């Protein structure tokens, strides 16, 4: 996949929540693992033969709130995941719980974009250095090597605010 490209930033996923309550009041176990822990679907590194450690960082990807399109053919199949309904400007908009590295990656990408807005001269290496210096390493992340990295979490959980201060 794309995570194997030399200067791609591979993102692991951790769980923002492990349970949720939908619009009907039913509570579900999201099936992703414990809140704050690595998501059970997240791949582990390192990429063999690669000088750049992968994953670089972990972002929230397990049980996160996302927009649902009522125009999607799958909309009815995901009713049990819908947790918010917003009426605005004549339209009704739905939000629900989703999981995947496809949720974690856009979160991390948006954070990096914020850093680049603060400092457009940041390089790939600078971004990795910021992740290395500011990644949150809690009890879930556990032990890291001399470079603050491990094969499950990369440099830890991305920290948007402290990274922005470093940018």
Identify the function of each model-found stretch.
Residues 1, 27, 31, 47, ...:
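Hydrophobic alpha-helical scaffolding
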Residues 8-13, 104, 113-114, 163:
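Stable alpha-helical structural segments in soluble proteins, enriched in small hydrophobic residues
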Residues 145-157:
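Zinc-dependent metallohydrolase catalytic domains
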Residues 157-167:
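Secreted peptidase-domain scaffold signal
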Residues 12, 44, 58, 99, ...:
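Short glycine-rich loop/turn motifs that provide flexible caps or phosphate-binding loops at active sites
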Residues 6, 33-36, 103-110, 126, ...:
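Generic recognition of stable, solvent-exposed alpha-helical segments in well-folded globular domains
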Residues 55-148:
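Hydrolase catalytic cores
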Residues 1-68, 134-135:
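Catalytic-core segments of hydrolase enzymes
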């Amino acid at each position: 996949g794309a995570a194997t490209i030399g200067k791609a930033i591979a993102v692991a996923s951790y769980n923002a929540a492990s349970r949720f309550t939908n619009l009907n009041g039913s509570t579900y176990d999201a099936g992703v693992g414990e809140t704050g822990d690595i998501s059970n679907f997240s791949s582990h590194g390192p990429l063999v033969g690669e000088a750049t450690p992968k994953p670089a960082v972990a972002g929230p990807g397990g049980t996160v709130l996302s927009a649902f399109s009522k125009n999607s053919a799958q909309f009815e199949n995901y009713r049990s995941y819908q947790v918010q309904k917003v009426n605005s400007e004549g339209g009704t908009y739905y939000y629900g719980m989703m999981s995947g590295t496809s949720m974690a990656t856009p979160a991390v990408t948006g954070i990096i974009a914020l850093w680049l807005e603060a400092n457009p001269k940041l390089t790939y290496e600078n971004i990795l250095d910021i992740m290395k210096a500011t990644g949150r390493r809690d009890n879930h992340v556990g032990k890291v090597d001399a470079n603050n990295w491990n094969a499950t979490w990369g440099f830890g959980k991305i920290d948007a605010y402290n990274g922005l201060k470093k940018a």
